[in-house]
Amino acid sequence: MPKMKSVKGAVKRFKVKKSGKIKRGTAYRSHILTKVDGKHHRQMRSSKHVDTVDAKNIKEMIN
């Protein structure tokens, strides 16, 4: 049986760390950020981890 192809959109959006957790970017950062207060804007810079519920599906898409 042939290997499953990875979902290229998921490969570009997620990275698997050494610990096995999946790193993702923050949503709502594209435009119209003048209305967002400075604290929230700074917090959106940092990357987040994917929830454990979604991690299994994302790992299947990446591999």
From Swiss-Prot:
Question: A single GO molecular function, which one?
Answer: structural constituent of ribosome
Q: Ribosomal protein: is it a keyword of this entry?
A: yes
Q: Which PROSITE patterns match?
A: RIBOSOMAL_L35
One Pfam family this sequence matches: Ribosomal_L35p
Listed A to Z, the keywords are:
Ribonucleoprotein, Ribosomal protein
Q: Name one GO biological process term.
A: translation
Record's Gene Ontology CC terms? Answer: cytosolic large ribosomal subunit
Q: Which family does it belong to?
A: Belongs to the bacterial ribosomal protein bL35 family.
Q: What is this protein called?
A: Large ribosomal subunit protein bL35
Q: Whose protein is this, by species?
A: Sulfurovum sp. (strain NBC37-1)
